[in-house]
Design a protein with these regions (language model features):
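Compositionally biased low-complexity segments at domain edges in trafficked proteins
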Residues: 114-133
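Beta-strand-dominated extracellular/periplasmic modules and repeats
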Residues: 2-111, 117-119
């Protein structure tokens, strides 16, 4: 089983983004399928990819604290495909700032027993994410 946490930093202001709505969703259905690719030269290869046709089901909902952290998203998650959805539109509107991103979704695969820390660096018109520790 795995755990998930996140940290949102407002890079335009140079400080943590407090009060950002966050929800964790799990893909229901889908699964791994084999896809075969071929080239004009006649060579081919097969790879395992995740079938993304399943429905998204909410697992939990929270908001970032004063330090921009969300520590209570989930504990003991089974393996699967998940996404964290950040309500960046509301956060920026509350500060009278405009953005082209009403929400930002980070989709990731959770496999085995591990901790997944997925920070979001946010500004009005850009964002970056990475797997933290």
């Amino acid at each position: 089983m795995s755990t998930i946490s996140t940290h949102v930093l407002d890079t335009a202001l140079g400080k943590p983004a407090a009060g950002v709505g966050v929800r964790l969703e799990k893909q229901d259905g889908g699964g791994w399928i084999e896809v075969t690719h071929s080239k004009d030269t006649g060579s081919a290869w097969t790879e395992q990819v995740h079938d993304m046709s399943g429905q998204w089901v909410e697992v939990s909902r929270s908001a970032t604290d004063g330090d921009g952290r969300c520590r209570d998203l989930a504990q003991d998650l089974p393996a699967g495909v998940y996404r964290i959805v950040f309500d960046t539109g509301s956060y920026l509107r509350n500060q009278r700032r405009a953005s082209i991103y009403p929400e930002i979704a980070i989709t990731f695969t959770c496999a085995g027993e591990a901790h997944y820390h997925l920070p979001l660096l946010l500004s009005d018109n850009s964002y970056t994410t990475y797997r933290g520790s």
